[in-house]
Amino acid sequence: MDGKTILPCSEVPEEFTWDLSDVFASDDKWSEELEALKAYPERMAAYAGKLGESAKTLLDWFTLSDEITVRVSKFVQYASCRSDQDVGNSFYQGMRSKAFSMSVALNSAGSFEASEIMAIPDETLARFYAEEPKLETYRRSIDKLRRRKAHILSPECEKILAAAGEISESPDRTFSMFHNADMRYPDVTDAKGEVHTLTDGTFVPMLMSADRTLRENAFKAYYKRAGEFRNTYASTLDAQFKQLKFFADARHYNSTLEASLDVTEVPVEVYTNLIDAVHGNLDKMYRYVELRKKILGVDELHMYDVYTPIVADADVEISFEEAKKTALEALAVLGRDYTDVLEEAFSNRWLDVYENTGKRGGAYCTGNGWPHPYVLLNHKDNLDSMFTLVHEMGHAMHTWHSCKYQPVNTAEYVIFVAEVASTCNEILLMRHLLGKTDDRKQRAYLINHFLDQFKGTLYRQTMFAEFELQMGKMAESGEALTADALSAKYLALNKLYFGDTMISDDEIALEWTRIPHFYYNYYVFQYATSFSAAVAIANRILREGESAVRDYKKFLSGGCSKEPVELLRDMGVDMRTPAPVNDALSLFGELIDELSALLG
């Protein structure tokens, strides 16, 4: 099989699909677990009002919580993976719904935890630690809860908010079902008149084509179709930010941004400093756009011209087998123990590889490492897909290390550091590929791809982050997120970030309709901060070798054992300053100069 053929999910060869039997042997076993999990709320209720009674009671509660965490994580993981393999399958969608309902029910059953732990006097808690040394394992979790004391409500209110958790997932679920399962796009033709199937999964690969007619036709057809449903898309985003505002207000935060970042202990200034730093380096982006226009030799550079490789004849087809081999070579610098786990993942079907009819688009790694993570891909046999592979395996290795070396309560790393490991893998792959060739055209092609990573990850994700911030402010001021308002704001940002050399086509005003991360609660800025941190970390690994690798594996194994900014500081990267962003964008400028010299 290759990345060009789109089959029904039932016809995809087994070797390219997940082996979910590592989690549950069958759907029936999953159903048995559903019944078993129903016993937990009663067991949890027995601890209500008692967490401050004794050290033993508190330890017993945390032990039970760990047990539930592992079982529920596996339970949700299995159902989510099943439903994402075929989003149109009503049985698996029902399974997913049951899984999330159970997760919400258990969260609700344990909602008294935060307020009760908050209420334990400092001197009593100190005595508990002295009486029961095993409680030290949970000190970090306890400290995180008590840090947010001003935002934790009464047990009754916490139970209501926990029960509302399922409702808060509705905008994301509705968008995902509509966008992935229900949306259909017209076929498009290339310069030769050949017909191509346009899907959400084939859209970007078409924009990467050297055929400008195909790029333009795909671009216009995709957004024409999206425009027909722009009010539906706007409605789901409006609901998303209204639910964020509801929870932020309920917990007495000043903004939806503050509420979202506080959960992961990231200072708000990290977010705003990123936007300011990128604004201060937009001149480099404008230089990149001008160079792209010059090399492509077009009178006007349009938004459908931003993905196609500048050195078109250097574009190569990379099979999944070749992508795996190259990934192992590039990441060998991280040690044999690292690549051994990668090989295990490849051999034991931790990955669902190719796009198929009804499969969820994009790529992701599940956040559960018990027994191991799973990775979803939509591999297209190109360079971008190879980078996606190492990116998602970076997530997988981060999850695997944290779940292996951290206790359950500190195994789940926060989003802010999640993208560092994945992006570091991408940087190491790029350095590996550049180190293998002196060919001017091949180097130019790779550097162009590297520059596109800067554009797509640092600049583009910061633009998304700024758009999210604008949506949050709209919701906070009571302004409705209408399709017209969103499109106007998005088009203005696109013009700011790409500059006057780029034609910001009217269609691009609707790009917000296709971005799933806008439903992830201020997630995307972390791609940009992580990219900046990853550049610094990868450079240190390549420069210092074993000592840096040793520190890096401590980072991978750190889970949430420290605040995320502190985990990065241990690697020598301080994201509370603009230095990492400025340094990364300085490299961007140097790469522009090198590409310009290579291509004359």
List the model feature ranges, each with a label.
Residues 1-50, 70, 74-269, 273, ...:
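His/Asp/Glu-rich acidic catalytic environments and adjacent acidic regulatory segments
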Residues 10-14, 25, 113, 117, ...:
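C-terminal, non-catalytic "cap/extension" segments appended to globular domains
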Residues 252, 380-400, 422, 427, ...:
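Active-site recognition of the HExxH zinc-binding catalytic motif
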Residues 295-339, 374-375, 398, 445, ...:
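Long, K/E/R/D-enriched contiguous segments that form extended
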Residues 316-320, 368-390:
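Short pre-active-site segment immediately N-terminal to the catalytic Zn-binding motif
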Residues 316-318, 351-371:
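Catalytic zinc-binding patch centered on the HExxH motif and its immediate surroundings
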Residues 329, 333-340, 366, 395, ...:
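Conserved helix-loop functional segments at active or binding sites
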Residues 413-442, 450-452, 456, 530:
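Post-HExxH zinc-binding segment in Zn-dependent metallohydrolases
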